[in-house]
Amino acid sequence: AWLPAQALAAGSLKAANSKARAFIQQAMQEHRIPGLQLAVVQYGKVVLLENCGFANVESRVPVTGKTLFPINSATKSFTGVAMMQLVQDGRVDLDAPLSRYLDDVPATWRGVRIRQLLGHTSGLPEIIDSQGAFGGATEPEAWSAVEARPLEVSPGEQFSYNQTNYGLLSRIIVKLSGQPYERFVTQRQFDVAGMPSTTFGDSYDLVAGAATIYSV
């Protein structure tokens, strides 16, 4: 017997979505995740959209489609896109040294290539430690402290994920665009993509509709 391709596709999608839901429920239980949002996009179309669990466990506030979640280091994706937009604008060369764009960095940092910052192969020391900003509570103090440390390895030698790389990229974006990082990303990405609920802030901000942050 022959079944129309559309019917087969619909059946396969339904089965895949069912497996995705089961996987998410299992992951939430195993990792003690109180709540999350899930979206699956296939060929530019949303094929699964789920709101699971609670935004606030104590008050039993459910996650909805309007619940806001902090995305933390996923923000690096926006920084990477912003840098590539500057490349397309002819403002940035990925193979250029850091010193071409920032003249106030240590001598040992000056030869690091932009693509090495993007790919976490710069060899630069980490500006964030287990207590937060390295060397002090303020950003200038943290930069002063980390700039006094030696390179961990030679640039391009190995991958080492850290915050220093993308902090420097953010400074380049600010310098070349002539506007705050947040405004550049909002205008060039969020506004273009139709993301009005995506914004910037820190962990001390009180944001209406935001999920409570929990740690295990």
Which residues fall in each region the model found?
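N-terminal twin-arginine translocation
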Residues: 2-10
